[in-house]
Amino acid sequence: MKTGRVLKISGPLVVAEGMEEANIYDVVKVGEKRLIGEIIEMREDRASIQVYEETAGLAPGDPVITTGEPLSVELGPGLIEAMFDGIQRPLNAIKAKAGDFITKGVEVHSLDRDKKWHFTPVKKVGDTVEAGDVIGIVQETSIVEHKIMVPYGIKGTIETIEEGDFTVVDTVAKVKDKDKVSDLMMMQKWPVRRGRPYGRKLNPAQPMITGQRVIDTFFPVTKGGTACVPGPFGSGKTVVQHQLAKWADAQIVVYIGCGERGNEMTDVLNEFPELKDPKTGEPLMKRTVLIANTSNMPVAAREASIYTGITIGEYFRDMGYSIALMADSTSRWAEALREMSGRLEEMPGDEGYPAYLGSRAAEFYERAGNVVSIGSEEREGALTVIGAVSPPGGDLSEPVTQATLRIVKVFWGLDAQLAYRRHFPAINWLNSYSLYIEKISPWMDENVASDWTALRIKAMSLLQEEASLEEIVRLVGIDALSEKDRLKLEVAKSLREDYLQQNAFHEVDTYASLGKQYKMLKLVLFFYDEAQRALNAGVYLKELLDLEVRDKIARAKYISEENIENIDAIFNELSEVIDQLISKGGIMNA
């Protein structure tokens, strides 16, 4: 391949000449240290190259060699439990080769070429296969069965296939189509900027259970859905993302740390091996892929890290798994776009972001979905994408937030005021929304309880009434309210503090199953119904608010999943206490 020459260097942007044989999005090696870059613009024989490593030390005249291939990821056994940088270089392998700091031009394979995996065929010689068909399985971790699929573009009859221990580049099967014989390895490559093909998209109808009460009850996201978590600094975006990565009922989690602080990735690395998956009892790390592209790594690689992560997510989706992808934070990705756009001297849009910010964000989020995979056997997989957005100063009218809100169906708006009041997760129930509620309400009513939707609507209306009553209280004081309105305020407070508030660092409260959420919500609303009955019978509000059973309602969140029937005892106690108050006839008649 012909070698070009560096003409100009501007931070992560390098312009090279003599590149007439190259194509846009080709990967190139720049300079004597062979820095990895990607062509993002071609003008005659000049190529504008986005370099994914530090460009200090490059000089005009340095060689630029094109590989003739687009930026691709290696897909195969070895992805789970691994930690990659933004362009899928394994950080453990880099540390072994170059020490604690990533040196320029270091080259390592994304997947280990020496490790052997036990391949068990599920097809036999003579079977006809096509792209997407599963030919064998590898038990990658104790909970992830890695399915080896026929790569896109290959079909035919299996000539040879054998069981045994192989590396990812060994031939495990041969497929013959007419006169052409294709060798199948356990590894395949896929360009990151192109979505992997699928048979057809399905309407998402099943919720992704997260164990976070405010999300599952009020603003659920479906498997295959899209959601965003915008919020100012310190409002808890990363903790929400960590909670979702820990407890979401997805089979695989892909966590992309895009331009955020390194200690947040350290938290994940420290916590996930210790925490147990509630369904399998195995460490959470055994179902997780980490992509660490922290704030002290080159800016340009942030742009690639988002695509690297979603391509890995699509690969596992094609196996028929449910995937949850967390991107923290898409604002840093947008800032990388803005920096490259500025250096390319493109016409700026709002706040300096490129005019194509909205279309790039849409390209990313539309790769989510609930799909039927390609292949002769139907497999249904789901890829759920949850992106954090970090608007400066919490201003939700800024371009990245607005571009994201036009695309995603769920908005979990984090509120600085709630965070300052130590209400976590600080998701504002008055601003947030989910457009999936109507689709998943039938599933909830069928699988959790027939009155789930009714309880949810009742609780939300109480919280909304509280907001309007608080305005009256601020103007004329609480004494202007009737006892029934004051009861509403108390029940709404109970909903906020005893139900919506959740401690991510408490061993019991960090996760609540749907069954427990239903009983807790019903308990708070049962108190409201019983208290209304008592008020109508002449009982005074103060007596109701002083009941000891209210402490038990507040502590219901700390009842473990094994002892969930203890909540039923609180229902019975509450009924008895209210009946006693009514029979006594109120404080004046006592």
Curated annotation (Swiss-Prot):
Pfam families linked to this entry: ATP-synt_ab (PF00006), ATP-synt_ab_N (PF02874), ATP-synt_ab_Xtn (PF16886), ATP-synt_VA_C (PF22919)
E.C. code: 7.1.2.2
Reactions the enzyme catalyzes: ATP + H2O + 4 H(+)(in) = ADP + phosphate + 5 H(+)(out)
Family annotation (PROSITE patterns): ATPASE_ALPHA_BETA
SUPFAM superfamilies, A to Z: C-terminal domain of alpha and beta subunits of F1 ATP synthase (SSF47917), N-terminal domain of alpha and beta subunits of F1 ATP synthase (SSF50615), P-loop containing nucleoside triphosphate hydrolases (SSF52540)
UniProt keywords, alphabetically: ATP synthesis, ATP-binding, Hydrogen ion transport, Ion transport, Nucleotide-binding, Translocase, Transport
UniProt xrefs under CDD domains: ATP-synt_V_A-type_alpha_C, ATP-synt_V_A-type_alpha_N, V_A-ATPase_A
GO MF entry, a single one: ATP binding
Binding sites annotated in the UniProt record for ATP: G231, P232, F233, G234, S235, G236, K237, T238
The keyword Ion transport appears for this protein: yes
UniProt record, GO biological process: proton motive force-driven plasma membrane ATP synthesis; proton transmembrane transport
Sequence similarity: Belongs to the ATPase alpha/beta chains family.
Role according to the record: Produces ATP from ADP in the presence of a proton gradient across the membrane. The V-type alpha chain is a catalytic subunit.
Entry protein name: V-type ATP synthase alpha chain
